[in-house]
Amino acid sequence: MWQALYEELGDKGFVPISVALDESPDAARPYIEKANPQHPSLIDTEHVVAHRYGLINVPAVIWIDEAGKIVRPSTAEYGTDQFVQFHGRESGPFLDAVRAWVNTGEVRTDEAVPSHMPAPTDDEEVARAEWALAWFLHQQGKTEAAAQHFARAGELSPDDWTIRRGSMPIQGQNPMGPEFFELFKDWEARGKTTHATMAAEREN
């Protein structure tokens, strides 16, 4: 999808940068090679992008203009309607919004687009530090200690799927298996927090 948009809009200055949050380059490489993108496609094993841009789930899209300014904060968006019955967000309006932004400068929003990027809470900051420590310990082969810190990170930031679901494959769990569905049930019970609802809550 991104390659198709790049081919369509690239001559107007549009450059998508895709970033995979995966535990190793090998985990993401097959998908990147299959897509054969001509635009930058990165693999972030340290979750730097998630931490710096406040991502709590993927796929998420951030619009950044030529001056380096964020003009549309992190929003859950989808390039196809393959899983629309699961998440309920159609791809068409998003793709049209990208085209409008590139062609006219119009930044379209809707109820799913946060009004701003809220600063992380103290617990969320600690959660990210816990995740980083867990990942370091895991790479050192200290899996039991790592598991404790992964769990603590999830407790401190329970609505952050990049932490909770992102640690599943690292720990040998299936991110689409039973653990994922338990996470989904917990997320539903907690009110289905999204980037937009989080931003709205912190405005008050």
PLM feature spans:
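Short, internal strand/loop/helix patches
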Residues: R29-V58, I62-I64
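Structural microenvironment flanking redox-active thiols in thiol-disulfide oxidoreductases
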Residues: M1-K34, T45-E46
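Short coil turns that delineate tetratricopeptide repeat
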Residues: E124, S157-P158
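Alpha-helical linker/edge segments of TPR/alpha-solenoid repeat scaffolds
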Residues: I170-M198
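Thiol-/selenol-based redox modules, centered on thioredoxin-like
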Residues: D65-K142, Q171
